[in-house]
Every structure is written in C-alpha cells, then in structure tokens.
UniProtKB/Swiss-Prot annotation:
Its EC number is 1.2.1.12. The active site is at C156 (nucleophile). SMART domains: Gp_dh_N. Homotetramer. InterPro entries: GlycerAld/Erythrose_P_DH, GlycerAld_3-P_DH_AS, GlycerAld_3-P_DH_cat, GlycerAld_3-P_DH_NAD(P)-bd, Glyceraldehyde-3-P_DH_1, NAD(P)-bd_dom_sf. This is Glyceraldehyde-3-phosphate dehydrogenase, cytosolic. Pathway: Carbohydrate degradation; glycolysis; pyruvate from D-glyceraldehyde 3-phosphate: step 1/5.
Length: 342
C-alpha cells in the first residue's frame, strides 16, 4: 500500500456482490485481485458465473481462464482460489492481500470478520451492515475513518439514502423523515412460496408479489450521520425486478424551501463534492435506465413532489448491485490512502 503500488484485494464469498466487486476491481488500475474464497462453488463454476451475468451482461474485458483447481487467470493475472469454510484458514497473507472483502453475508460482526486477520489480511471490508463494526458511506462520512482494521460499507440502500439526506440536512435541516425503498429482488428471496420462519412474507414468491419488508437502512443513516440519529426510519417493498431500486424519502424541513431550491442544492452537490456518488436527472427515466450505473444515488427531479415548503417527497434511484460494489472498492482505496498518509 505504498506509493503507486496496486492495492492487493481478496474476496470471501463469490455471490452477487463478490462477483461484481471482482469486475469493478479488474476494471481499475489501482487494484489487484489476488485471491477468492468460496466453499460452495467449484473453480469451473466460479469461472462460468463470473463470465455470464443475466443483469450486467457477459464479461468481455479480459480472458478468464481456469488453469488448475486452485488457480484462475483474469487477463493473464493469476488469482488463487480457495474453498475454506473457516475464514481463519484462508491464507490471505500468502498472496499479500492487504484488504479482504467479506461478502458472504455471514461474517458481519467484528469478531467473525476478524478471522480474516488470522489468515494474514490487514483490513476487512464487510459488504453489509454490521452491528458493531464502524460503518462508512462514501461521500458522507469516510473522512471519519481512523485506521480501523474491520469496517462495514453499510447497505446499498443506506448508500443511496445517506448522500441525499446529508445534502438536504446540511442545507435545510431535517426535522424527521420516513423512507420507503422499492427494492429489486435479492438472492435471499424465494422463486416460489417457501419456508421463511423469521419473515413469513419474505418467504412468498419473489416473482409474483410485491412484498413489504423491514429494513434498517434509514436508521443506519443515524450511524453515519449522527445529527440525524432518531430522525429517520423506513421500510421496504420487494418487487419482481432483477436489479435497480428506488428510495422515496419524505421529510419535514427545518427551514422552508421551494422544490426548485431543493433541486438546485442537490444538483450543485452532484456536480461538486459528491460527484460520482450523487447524481441528478430531469429526464423521464425508469428503473432499467440505471442498470450498471456506478453512482450510489441518482436524484429524480421530476419524480419528487412538495406539499408545502417544509414537507417534501424526494426520489432517488440506485443500482443496488453495481453502484454498491463500486463503493466497496472506493472505500478500500480510501482506506489504503489513509494508511499511507499516517
């Protein structure tokens, strides 16, 4: 992590986010993917799943070749492959992995994620909310990072909501707010009705239902923006689309503002300090227009409405897979830069 050397990254869990983080990493000049661990898929199947993606299309940027049971190459660059169930057994140190992306959805607290450090990793980024690891949202609170070894990149929905909420709160003040995310189907849902003892509705067929669901994304904004702690909460509707979700944020403002003034504030932020994180559009867009959009949150100026100058509904789109995966990599790069500057 010194000078212009590439940041060496390993991935634990080669599911939706793991595979897309790999794609993002392979597209960047400052990242080197060195190892992948997944105990549930063979290297042959791993190669196939990486190459072919029903949502984001076929990978054509580099050749992906299986050389042996424990060895893949991406465009000539070797990547070690493991199938360890215990993260402490993955030899990250052998491959110089400075950072590990923990994307299994299983090892989401600090104690469990710390197992990667035993294998030689220096830092761990959890690609999910965590009950005890510090959470960072790029564009919002990454400047609070202080060389912690284990961090969380929060959730895709928090990454959409927090930049929007920060702009509105900084400019006008938020007294209170309710968020709804209309969220695309994810891997935890069932294709047809099936058992889901903790969430009965969540066990119903994803392909044929709009499913109300709980989400901690709005409350989590209070962890990355303490000034909004206790002021936001929300829920989700899971809908039968494969990717791209949309946040509907309804807030009471502290300072009166016209909808045009709100639009201007968001547009300025999208072109300034939050460029690449927060987007702005006045086009007549729909969800598929944002597939493989790398931004965290794209404000839809035409979709929002104001009841009064202190009560407004704001709408922002996000590719819950690709945008989030980009932020995982951005957080790694930010952490590496902070490490070299200390």
């Amino acid at each position: 992590m010194v000078g212009s050397a590439k940041i060496k990254v390993g991935i634990n869990g080669f599911g939706r986010i793991g595979r897309l983080v790999a794609r993002v990493a392979l597209e960047r000049d400052d990242i080197e993917l060195v190892a992948i661990n997944d105990p549930f898929i063979t290297p042959e199947y791993m190669t196939y799943m990486f190459k072919y993606d029903s949502t984001h299309g076929q990978w054509k940027k580099t050749e992906v070749t299986l050389h042996s049971e424990g060895h893949l190459t991406f465009g000539g660059n070797p990547v070690a492959v493991y199938a360890c169930r215990d993260p402490s057994e993955i030899p990250w140190g052998k491959h110089g992995a400075d950072f590990v992306v923990e994307s299994t959805g299983v090892f989401t607290d600090k104690d469990k994620a710390a197992a990667h450090l035993k294998g030689g990793a220096k830092k761990v980024v959890i690609s999910a909310p965590s009950k005890d690891a510090p959470m960072f949202v790029m564009g919002v609170n990454e400047n609070k990072y202080s060389d912690e070894d284990i961090v969380s990149n929060a959730s895709c929905t928090t990454n959409c909501l927090a930049p929007l909420a920060k702009v509105i709160n900084d400019k006008f003040g938020i007294l209170e707010g309710l968020m709804t995310t209309v969220h695309a189907t994810t891997a935890t849902q069932k294709t047809v009705d099936g058992p889901s003892s903790k969430d009965w509705r969540g066990g119903r067929s994803a392909a044929t239902n709009i499913i109300p669901s709980a989400t901690g994304a709005a409350k989590a904004v209070g962890k990355v923006l303490p000034e909004l702690n206790g002021k936001l909460t929300g829920m989700a509707f899971r809908v039968p689309t494969t990717d791209v979700s949309v946040v509907d944020l309804t807030v009471r403002l502290e300072k009166p503002a016209s909808y045009d003034a709100i639009k201007t504030a968001i547009k300025e932020a999208s072109e300034g300090q939050m460029k690449g994180i927060l987007g702005y559009t006045e086009d007549d867009v729909v969800s598929t227009d944002f597939i493989t959009d790398s931004r965290s949150s794209i404000f839809d100026a035409k979709a929002g409405i104001a009841l009064s100058d202190t009560f407004v509904k704001l709408v922002a789109w996000y590719d819950n897979e690709w945008g989030y995966s980009n932020r995982v990599v951005d957080l790694i790069v930010h952490m590496a830069k902070q490490g070299t500057s200390q």
